[in-house]
C-alpha cells in the first residue's frame, strides 16, 4: 500500500507540474527549389546575363540552374544564425518576453535562436531540407514558422538582387569596352581604305588617267595599283565610302542591341520567392513538452519504487 500511495502521489505531482511548466509546441516545414514563375523577373534577367556569358564563352558547362542558385541562397539564409537572430529581434513574440535585463534578454534570445532548427536534406535518401520552430503555443509555432520562412526568403532575394546588380554593372562595362573596340577597329579599317583611295586618286590625276586602264576586277587590285581604275571610278568610290562610313558586322549590331538593354539597368523585385513548400507549416496537435502521460507514468513508477524501498526498509528494521 505504501508504494501505491507513493506512486500515486508522485503521479499527481507530475500532473500538477504539467499545468504550470512552460509548454513547447513545434511546427515543421519542408522546402524545395522554387519554380520559374516564383522567381518572376529575376529569372529572366539572370538568364539574360547567362546568355551574354554563353556568347562570350564565359559560361561554365556545369553551371547550376537559376532556380538552384536561388534556392541555395535561401537555404543559406534559412540556416544562418544571423537570420534567426534578426528575425526574433523584430518579432512581438520576443519583445513581449523581454524583462529589461540585458543578460536575461540575451539568454532568452539565444534560446529562441536555438528553437529554430534547420535540418539539411539528404538527396541520396530522397530527404528534402526541413526547418522546425518551437514556441509556447501551437498557433505561435505555426505562424512564427511561416513568418520565418518568408523572412529568410526575403533576405535571400535581397542578396540575389545585390548580386544581380553587381553582375549587370560588370557586364555593362565589358560590353561597352567590346563595342568601343569594334568601333575602333572599324574606324581604323575605314581610315585606311579612305587613305588608299585618296592616294590612288592623286596618282590618277597626276597621270591624267580618265578611264580604267586595267582588266583586273577592282576588288582584286592591290592598293599600289588602284590608280589604274581611273579618276572617275576612284572619285565615285571615294564619295560612296564617305557616304556609307565605317562598316560593321552582325556581331557589332548584336552587341549594340545588348548594350542598349544593359544601359536600361535591371528591374529588381524585392519579394520574389526563393523556395516552394513540400510541407506547409500547420498548427501542431501534440505538444513536444511537457508530455503529461509520459511524466505521470514515469514519476508514478519512480514513486512506487521509492515507496517499495521505504516499506522494505521498515520491515528490515522490525
PLM features per residue range, with description:
Residues 2-3:
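Short, small-residue-biased leader/transition segments that mark boundaries at the very start
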Residues 6-11, 15, 300-304:
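Alpha-helical transmembrane spans of integral membrane proteins, capturing the lipid-embedded, hydrophobic core
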Residues 257-304:
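Interfacial amphipathic helix/helix-coil modules
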Residues 23-27, 127-131, 273-274:
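Envelope-exposed proteins and targeting segments
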Residues 310-318:
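C-terminal membrane-anchoring or membrane-association module
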Residues 75-263:
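Soluble oligomerization/assembly scaffold segments of membrane-associated complexes
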Residues 18-71, 75, 193, 197-213, ...:
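Short, glycine-rich, amphipathic interfacial segments at transmembrane boundaries or analogous
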Amino acid at each position: 500500500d505504501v508504494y501505491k500511495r507513493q506512486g500515486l502521489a508522485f503521479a499527481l505531482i507530475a500532473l500538477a507540474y504539467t499545468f504550470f511548466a512552460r509548454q513547447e509546441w513545434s511546427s515543421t516545414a519542408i522546402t524545395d527549389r522554387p519554380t520559374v514563375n516564383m522567381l518572376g523577373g529575376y529569372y529572366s534577367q539572370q538568364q539574360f546575363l547567362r546568355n551574354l556569358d554563353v556568347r562570350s564563352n564565359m559560361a561554365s558547362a556545369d553551371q547550376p540552374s537559376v532556380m538552384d542558385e536561388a534556392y541555395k541562397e535561401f537555404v543559406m539564409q534559412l540556416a544562418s544564425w544571423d537570420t534567426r537572430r534578426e528575425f526574433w529581434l523584430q518579432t512581438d513574440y520576443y519583445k513581449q518576453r523581454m524583462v529589461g535585463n540585458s543578460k536575461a534578454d540575451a539568454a532568452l534570445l539565444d534560446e529562441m535562436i536555438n528553437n529554430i532548427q534547420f535540418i539539411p536534406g539528404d538527396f541520396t535518401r530522397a530527404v528534402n531540407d526541413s526547418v522546425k520552430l518551437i514556441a509556447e503555443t501551437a498557433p505561435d509555432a505555426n505562424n512564427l514558422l511561416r513568418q520565418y520562412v518568408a523572412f529568410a526568403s526575403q533576405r535571400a532575394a535581397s542578396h540575389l538582387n545585390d548580386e544581380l546588380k553587381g553582375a549587370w554593372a560588370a557586364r555593362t562595362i565589358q560590353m561597352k569596352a567590346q563595342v568601343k573596340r569594334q568601333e575602333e577597329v572599324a574606324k581604323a579599317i575605314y581610315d585606311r581604305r579612305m587613305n588608299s583611295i585618296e592616294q590612288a586618286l592623286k596618282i590618277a590625276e597626276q597621270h591624267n588617267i580618265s578611264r580604267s586602264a586595267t582588266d583586273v576586277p577592282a576588288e582584286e587590285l592591290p592598293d599600289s595599283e588602284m590608280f589604274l581604275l581611273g579618276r572617275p571610278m576612284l572619285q565615285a568610290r571615294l564619295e560612296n565610302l564617305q557616304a556609307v562610313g565605317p562598316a560593321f558586322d552582325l556581331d557589332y549590331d548584336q552587341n549594340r542591341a545588348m548594350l542598349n538593354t544593359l544601359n536600361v539597368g535591371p528591374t529588381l523585385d524585392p519579394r520574389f520567392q526563393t523556395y516552394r513548400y513540400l510541407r506547409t507549416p500547420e498548427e501542431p496537435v501534440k505538444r513536444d513538452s511537457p508530455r503529461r502521460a509520459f511524466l505521470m507514468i514515469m514519476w508514478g513508477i519512480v514513486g512506487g519504487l521509492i515507496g517499495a524501498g521505504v516499506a522494505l526498509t521498515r520491515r528490515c528494521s522490525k
